[in-house]
Amino acid sequence: MNYLSTRGGMAPQPFSDILLEGLAPDGGLAVPEQLPQVSAETLESWRGLPYADLAFEVLSRFATDIPADDLRGLTRAAYTSQIFNSEDIVPLRPLDNGLSLLGLSEGPTLAFKDMAMQFLGQVFEYVLTRRDTTLNIVGATSGDTGSAAEYALRGKRGVAVFMLSPHGRMSAFQRAQMYSLQDENIHNIAVRGVFDEAQDIVKALSLIHI
């Protein structure tokens, strides 16, 4: 599986290259050359799989440059009951009248963004280690995205996080989540202004090619 830019100015690249690039060089988003097809029989065979193994089955259609055994190990490391405080990872809680509630806030920061970020933390470390390189990630947040990213990437080899946030404009809970982390690869930067101004700084930095 290779990826192309939505703006058409990038040669096809595999998943691991796209992972480390962020935006495509032409400023577009990376999208699959084609969407994988999954048959009804395959979907039925996935029924009842543990969440980590289901995640592997889906991601293996997109991250085809990562060996299957390695990718399965990454999903199983990302989605554990110790991290998500639930054996089901995304527990389904029955309500009245045949309705159920799907829990997406069982992760370390209680935000649904933990679902994606925990896998990203594992796969970033995996790819960077095998390429013997490092990566600096600069982001802007008004709360839950920054927390989820920092908790997923804390302590990971080869990656450093620099997270900008608007000074005094996050909840006390979100500030405590982010600013209490003491990991050497996590750096919180409070920006005097609103979130958009913090995001503008990140966008300006992304235009600098060293």
Tell where the protein language model's regions lie, with residue ranges.
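Well-ordered mid-protein domain cores that form the structural environment of catalytic cofactors
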Residues: 99-155
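N-terminal entrance/gating region of PLP-dependent enzymes' catalytic architecture
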Residues: 30-110
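Conserved small/polar residues in nucleotide/adenosyl-binding loops
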Residues: 208-210
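Short coil/turn connectors at secondary-structure junctions
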Residues: 26, 96-98, 132-135, 156-161, ...
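Cofactor-binding loop segments of dinucleotide-utilizing enzymes, especially the Rossmann-like FAD-
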Residues: 140-142, 164-166, 193
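Active-site-proximal loop->helix
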Residues: 147-189
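Charged, compositionally biased N-terminal leader segments and the immediate start
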Residues: 1-26
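Accessory "access/gating" subregions that flank catalytic or transport cores
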Residues: 190-194, 200-201
